[in-house]
Amino acid sequence: MRCPSCSSLDTQVKDSRPTEDSAVIRRRRVCMACNFRFTTFERVQLRELTVIKRNGRRVPFDRDKLVRSVQISLRKRPVEPEKVEKMVSAIVRELESAGEAEISSEAIGEIVMEHLRKLDDVAYVRFASVYRNFREAKDFEAVLGELSGDEMARLAALRLK
């Protein structure tokens, strides 16, 4: 593993432990050249996925990009990081187990929205507004209309706070 500080390849693992759900191994490493300490994470990858973008371009699937987009939609929301990690892992497993090497960005967006809807209504609406490229208030109304009555009541209560 290359040191992120000095780029040396001479690093050692000082500590390894699985995460709570044992889906990821966390490794603490130290660079033997500059003594910089850093953490890496190791997870199983079932298959290489390629994302077909809206413009037809094909790019490798990037789990970190998925995490960032989910975190943006959850910004300032009371959701524990462990729940976010579990959700992202579930999304990736779903994508990998679909049996396809290529998947459209639209399909990924729909899967993310499905999972966000179960996790946090506000994050669901935020993600939908970017993913579906909302341009007018009626676009928000349409997504809010998709939510069930209980979810609508919670969103209305949030607006009153």
UniProtKB/Swiss-Prot annotation:
The protein's name in its UniProt record: Transcriptional repressor NrdR
ZnF unnamed: positions: 3-34
Domain ATP-cone span(s) in chain numbering: 49-139
Pfam families (alphabetical): ATP-cone, Zn_ribbon_NrdR
Region annotation (Disordered) ranges: 1-20
Keywords: ATP-binding, DNA-binding, Metal-binding, Nucleotide-binding, Repressor, Transcription, Transcription regulation, Zinc, Zinc-finger
GO terms of biological process kind: negative regulation of DNA-templated transcription
Segments of skewed composition (Polar residues): 1-11
Function: Negatively regulates transcription of bacterial ribonucleotide reductase nrd genes and operons by binding to NrdR-boxes.
GO molecular function, one term: DNA binding
UniProt-listed NCBIfam families: transcriptional regulator NrdR (TIGR00244)
Cofactor note: Binds 1 zinc ion.
Superkingdom as given in the UniProt entry: Bacteria
UniProt keyword annotation of Aminoacyl-tRNA synthetase present: no
Source species taxonomy: Bacteria, Pseudomonadati, Pseudomonadota, Alphaproteobacteria, Hyphomicrobiales
Cofactor: Zn(2+)
Family indicated by similarity: Belongs to the NrdR family.
InterPro entries: ATP-cone_dom, NrdR-like_N, RNR_NrdR-like
Originating organism: Rhodopseudomonas palustris (strain BisB18)
